[in-house]
């Protein structure tokens, strides 16, 4: 079941879903808009090969600021301004707001698991031309879905509680 605006307001009022900071204008008909945060990670251009065990920080440049330019075909990691906390019976789909998609930006399919909490780090692919984005701009849209029953294994992974743009944390198997 997708949560509509009335449901979302109720869940937020009860503290079952937490979005902080939250402004009422970001609650939409069937979801909540999230804003661009103050940090971005750019992939460094390098011939170095990433392999298991290497520190991923050597492959990124992290910038802090109030505005960022996403260059043509660039792949960046962007953090949301908001901290999100979901209960064990709600998950969310992350979508790019259509105005940014119409500029050619792209966000791959992304899910926020039931039980997750933290700022969201989202992959963004650049357009055919540079696009400037500003901190605080409504950029993403979260659509919340309630599961029929609480999940048996809520999210407790390595990205739980993340703050700021978060680089990959995994090992190849």
Swiss-Prot record:
Keywords: Hydrolase, Nucleotide metabolism, Nucleotide-binding. It catalyses: dCTP + H2O + H(+) = dUTP + NH4(+). The keyword Metal-binding does not apply. InterPro entries: dCTP_deaminase, dUTPase-like_sf, dUTPase_trimeric. Its EC number is 3.5.4.13. The active site is at residue 123. GO terms for biological process: dUMP biosynthetic process; dUTP biosynthetic process. One of its GO terms (molecular function) is nucleotide binding. Pathway: Pyrimidine metabolism; dUMP biosynthesis; dUMP from dCTP (dUTP route): step 1/2. DCTP binds at residues 97-102, 113, 155, 162. Belongs to the dCTP deaminase family. Homotrimer. Catalyzes the deamination of dCTP to dUTP. NCBIfam families: dCTP_deam (TIGR02274). HAMAP family: dCTP_deaminase (MF_00146). This is dCTP deaminase. It comes from Acidianus ambivalens (Desulfurolobus ambivalens). The lineage of its organism: Archaea, Thermoproteota, Thermoprotei, Sulfolobales, Sulfolobaceae. The gene is dcd.
């Amino acid at each position: 079941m997708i949560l509509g605006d009335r449901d979302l307001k109720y869940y937020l009022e009860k503290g079952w879903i937490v979005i902080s900071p939250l402004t009422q204008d970001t609650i939409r008909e069937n979801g909540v808009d999230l804003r661009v945060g103050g940090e971005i990670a750019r992939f460094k251009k390098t011939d170095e090969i990433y392999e298991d065990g290497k520190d991923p920080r050597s492959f990124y440049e992290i910038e802090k600021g109030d505005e960022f330019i996403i260059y043509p075909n660039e792949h960046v990691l962007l953090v949301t301004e908001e901290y999100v906390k979901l209960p064990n019976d709600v998950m969310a789909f992350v979508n790019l707001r259509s105005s940014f998609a119409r500029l050619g930006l792209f966000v791959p399919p992304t899910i926020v698991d039931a039980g997750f909490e933290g700022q969201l780090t989202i992959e963004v692919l650049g357009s055919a031309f540079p696009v400037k984005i500003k901190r605080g701009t409504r950029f993403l849209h979260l659509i919340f879905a309630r599961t029929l029953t609480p999940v048996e294994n809520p999210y407790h992974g390595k990205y739980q509680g993340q703050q700021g743009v978060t680089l990959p944390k995994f090992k190849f198997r």
